[in-house]
């Protein structure tokens, strides 16, 4: 059984705020329309760098997690948005 009590609630709330802000700005579950995985990857990388540089203009750590969660959902539900093959080298 999954034990949701193991997830730290305060940090989970920070991620949930990202979803709520998006719903207010773009509409309920708009993120489920999907975007190429590269868009989530690029955004996560930008937010990770901003977090690492201690940029305080938004919750960059939560944005990193939000992007990864959306990428995971896209990977499982929108295989047509998986553009990783376009960026791999042989």
Q: Predicted regions span which residues?
A:
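Intrinsically disordered, low-complexity regulatory regions
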Residues: 1-90
